């Protein structure tokens, strides 16, 4: 029980630092109080490192050191939290989002299934994009990064013998998504 309390306290510290960087302090604290607990994902660190190395091999984006504050942190959250933070409170289909080095994943995703693991891979692309290039500076930057993340996710899925046609079609909607979420 002590360990669970420490993990949850660490998660609230992550939420607090995110709030300070986005100036959404009230919203984040409100969500932290009313949402279901945030739990660190039980993700094998070797999986994360393997994915980061693969992304590096393809893109050349450098990887933060494991003990760096920029090294990825994976947290499971409920869908309401994702909708509040990634979709400005509107209902959306986003199963995850990334803020700096922190990946927030819907708590119903299974990382042992190809969909869940490929979404983690997609979000790790965003972690490395942030680490290498900083924040998005607008819709054009956001669209380019999303396009790269979806293309790498599709390669990841295909290499494992799966096909997810929606990965190819979603890139056609990036401009509309940009207008909706990144005004």
Language model regions located:
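Bacterial N-terminal signal peptides that target proteins for export
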Residues: 18-26
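Bacterial N-terminal signal peptides
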Residues: 28-34
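N-terminal amphipathic/basic-hydrophobic helices that include classical n-h-c signal peptides
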Residues: 1-19, 161
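Auxiliary, metal-adjacent structural segments of Zn-dependent hydrolase domains
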Residues: 41-103, 110-113
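Catalytic Zn2+-binding segment of zinc metalloproteases
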Residues: 124-140
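Short alpha-helix carrying the canonical HExxH Zn2+-binding catalytic motif
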Residues: 113-128
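Post-HExxH zinc-binding segment in Zn-dependent metallohydrolases
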Residues: 139-172
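Second-shell loop/turn segments in exported
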Residues: 106-110, 136-142
């Amino acid at each position: 029980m002590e360990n669970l309390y420490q993990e949850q306290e660490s998660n609230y510290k992550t939420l607090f630092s995110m709030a300070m960087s986005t100036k959404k302090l009230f919203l984040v604290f409100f969500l932290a109080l009313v949402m279901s607990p945030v739990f660190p994902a039980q993700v094998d660190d070797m999986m994360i490192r393997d994915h980061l190395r693969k992304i590096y091999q393809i893109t050349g984006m450098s990887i933060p050191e494991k003990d760096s504050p920029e090294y990825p942190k994976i947290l499971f959250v409920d869908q309401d939290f994702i909708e509040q933070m990634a979709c400005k409170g509107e209902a959306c289909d986003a199963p995850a989002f990334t803020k700096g080095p922190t990946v927030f994943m819907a708590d119903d995703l299974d990382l042992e299934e190809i969909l869940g693991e490929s979404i983690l891979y997609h979000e790790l692309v965003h972690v490395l994009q942030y680490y290498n290039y900083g924040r998005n500076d607008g819709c054009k930057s956001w669209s380019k990064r999303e396009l790269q993340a979806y293309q790498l996710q599709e390669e990841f899925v295909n290499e494992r013998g799966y096909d997810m046609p929606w990965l190819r079609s979603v890139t056609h909607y990036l401009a509309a998504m940009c207008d909706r979420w990144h005004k």
